[in-house]
């Protein structure tokens, strides 16, 4: 048995949802996040610590406490799904609970293992303040550089011992204060900044059972690290932390005590942004009932940061359309480019994204609509089993959905995790550089009709484009009209069929989750869009005939890159470059620019002429046609090397 000791109570109050005290209990291995927050929150005695050059609070606990990491053990979807899995396989309850808590309640699970306990239970988790602290500070910062990146460390098999070493990215840390306050010794180790440390939980293989309920093997439940490994990103030095813990390239004091402490650069923010906006909103909306330890303002900030990631760093769309006068039809091509370092979407198989293509005539009447959705968030015209991958779409009830559909040992569709033996379909868009025979390809395979699509992750014989092209044929149109075409990428954390399968279980945890789910806005999140108007007469319509496009080359670059912007017509342009925190580095405005290609160069400096740090930046183009109040935008990711 291990002892819990109280150190200090830390809470934050704001209007609305109140941020409850972070736990300060301790054990042989761990200390709660409240103990870390004593020093790593923007507060006295040194109130100048943990703020950026604009005076913004960038403290670790302020960012972390409203993330899915902090709330991993509170997450109502996870708790409902665990109970449903146990109900389906009650003889494997101990296996399920121990496996799931290894990453959702790691302090409780790891401490129990250290104490000689073979299996950790949900009941124990609920009574353990450290377990309920989720993926807390003392977990990630104590993971040792042992077997990282190897199968031995995947699926929650990270190594933590009782040496009480806290690993960080900076050399020569000040040791005394941390030793005296929490009995941890800070030490520098580069592995804390590597993707491999994230892979310990975000590479998850789960056992699957056959019809007799016997464990018959294991299959990948989520493997974003392996997807990243089989991409261009490792060679570019772009780690998980680059996007999900973006760096502030400023001199920042990392602790509010001792008062004489110097600054460090950079600070990787503990925002842990991802694609789970839906569950963040649920945690915020029902925080009092769930017992979250963050305020409404905390959650709103994390939601905003997550939306910024989805909108700027997930996918880019382009669109072209041709009028076929012989058939009175439109031929439309929508290109999708994956901007992330893993598949899009990635991780848990409840997620999906789809293209919504809408064609309207000049009176605003919809003449074609693929990918429409209803009030429940379900896609209109979805096939009964599952929607296959499409290369060409000719009917409104055909829709391009990027998803992975699990199968059991009989090749039947399943949503039960312990029945997942593989996938019937996996056309999630791979990252740039992904090869069918590349590293870990057996665990990240493209499945289904996408393997036969010459435009999916391919350009002719070239593999690894990290994109897709979908062709639409819209017939039965009038030759005397103009048509407005819009394409939108919609994203959804929980597909309605996945949710409905869960709701079939009569369990208290499922009822709780369902009650929250049914009060949520179930609309998908639009994360990218592109539009075009085409005139069948050949006369330019009110909106552009071609699209706003941006290309960057070389990319990655050093010392200079060219930014080419294709303007659909005459107008005004604003070019802005942001870091991954959303901070504007430079802005260029040009008025009365002519239609066609415009070119700008960037040398990696900010508006003050100062050299920026190496890393990922986002170029955003905003364009307004002459005389039009409507702005169109295009984004592109730039990698600056040194």
Question: Can you describe what each PLM-predicted range is?
Answer:
Residues 2-10:
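Sec-dependent signal peptide recognition
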Residues 20-52:
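N-terminal module-boundary/linker segments of secreted carbohydrate-active enzymes
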Residues 45-85, 117-464, 470-477, 485-535:
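Primarily the internal scaffold of c-type cytochrome electron-transfer domains
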Residues 468-472, 596-600:
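Short strand-edge motifs at loop-to-beta-strand transitions and within beta-strands
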Residues 475-480, 607-609:
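Short, surface-exposed loop/turn segments at beta-strand-coil junctions that are enriched for proline
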Residues 481, 594-598, 613-616:
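A glycine-anchored, Pro-Gly-centered beta-turn/N-cap motif
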Residues 540-553, 557-579, 587-591, 599-601, ...:
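Glycine-centered coil/turn sites that cap beta-strands in beta-rich domains
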Residues 601, 610-642:
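C-terminal tail/sorting-segment detector
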């Amino acid at each position: 048995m291990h002892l819990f000791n109280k150190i200090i109570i830390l809470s934050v109050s704001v209007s609305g949802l109140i941020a409850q005290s972070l736990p300060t209990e301790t054990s042989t291995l761990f200390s709660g996040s409240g103990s870390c927050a004593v020093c790593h929150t923007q507060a006295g005695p040194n109130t100048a610590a943990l703020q950026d050059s604009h005076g913004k609070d960038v403290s670790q606990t302020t960012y972390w406490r409203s993330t899915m990491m902090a709330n991993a053990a509170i997450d109502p979807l996870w708790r409902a799904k665990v109970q449903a899995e146990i109900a389906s396989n009650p003889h494997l309850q101990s296996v399920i609970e121990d496996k799931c808590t290894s990453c959702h309640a790691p302090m409780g699970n790891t401490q129990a293992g250290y104490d000689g306990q073979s299996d950790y239970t949900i009941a124990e988790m609920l009574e353990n303040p450290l377990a309920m602290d989720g993926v807390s500070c003392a977990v990630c910062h104590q993971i040792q550089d042992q077997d990282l990146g190897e199968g031995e460390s995947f699926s929650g098999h990270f190594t933590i011992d009782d040496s009480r070493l806290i690993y960080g990215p900076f050399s020569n840390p000040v040791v005394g204060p941390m030793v005296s306050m929490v009995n941890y010794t800070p030490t520098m180790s580069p592995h804390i900044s590597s993707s491999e440390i994230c892979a310990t939980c975000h590479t998850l293989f789960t056992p699957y059972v056959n019809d007799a309920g016997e464990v018959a093997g294991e299959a990948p439940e989520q493997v974003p690290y392996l997807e990243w490994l089989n991409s261009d990103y490792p060679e570019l030095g772009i780690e998980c932390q680059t996007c999900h813990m973006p760096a502030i390239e400023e001199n920042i004091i990392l602790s509010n005590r001792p008062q004489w402490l110097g600054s460090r650069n950079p600070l990787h923010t503990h925002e842990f942004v991802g694609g789970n906006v839906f569950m963040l909103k649920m945690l915020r909306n029902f925080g009092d009932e769930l017992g979250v330890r963050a305020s409404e303002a905390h959650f709103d900030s994390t939601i905003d940061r997550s939306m910024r990631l989805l909108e700027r760093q997930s996918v880019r769309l382009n669109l072209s359309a041709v009028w076929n006068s012989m058939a009175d039809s439109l031929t439309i091509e929508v290109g999708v480019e994956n901007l992330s370092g893993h598949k899009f979407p990635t991780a848990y198989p409840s997620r999906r994204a789809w293209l919504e293509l809408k064609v309207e005539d000049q009176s605003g009447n919809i003449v074609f609509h693929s990918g429409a959705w209803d009030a429940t968030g379900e896609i209109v015209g979805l096939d009964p089993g599952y929607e296959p991958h499409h290369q060409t779409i000719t009917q409104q009830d055909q829709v391009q959905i990027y998803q992975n559909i699990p199968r059991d040992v009989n090749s039947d569709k399943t949503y039960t995790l312990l029945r997942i033996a593989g996938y019937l379909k996996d056309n999630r868009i791979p990252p740039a550089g992904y090869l069918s025979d590349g590293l870990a390809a057996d665990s990240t395979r493209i499945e289904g009709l996408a393997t036969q699509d010459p435009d999916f992750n391919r350009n002719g014989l070239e593999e690894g484009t990290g994109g897709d092209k979908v062709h639409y044929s819209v017939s039965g149109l009038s030759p005397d009209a103009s048509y407005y075409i819009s394409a939108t990428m919609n994203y959804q954390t929980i597909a309605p069929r996945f949710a409905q399968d869960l709701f079939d279980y009569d369990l208290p945890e499922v009822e709780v989750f369902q009650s929250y789910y049914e009060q949520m806005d179930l609309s998908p999140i639009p994360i990218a869009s592109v539009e075009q108007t085409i005139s069948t007469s050949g006369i330019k319509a009110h909106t552009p005939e071609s699209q706003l496009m941006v290309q960057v080359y070389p990319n990655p670059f050093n010392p200079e890159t060219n930014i080419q912007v294709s303007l659909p017509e005459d107008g005004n342009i604003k070019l802005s470059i942001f870091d991954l925190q959303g901070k504007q580095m430079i802005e260029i405005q040009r008025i009365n620019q002519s239609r066609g290609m415009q070119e700008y160069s960037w040398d990696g400096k900010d508006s003050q002429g100062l050299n920026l740090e190496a890393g990922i930046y986002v170029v955003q183009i905003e364009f307004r046609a002459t005389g039009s109040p409507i702005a169109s935008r295009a984004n592109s990711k730039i990698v600056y090397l040194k």
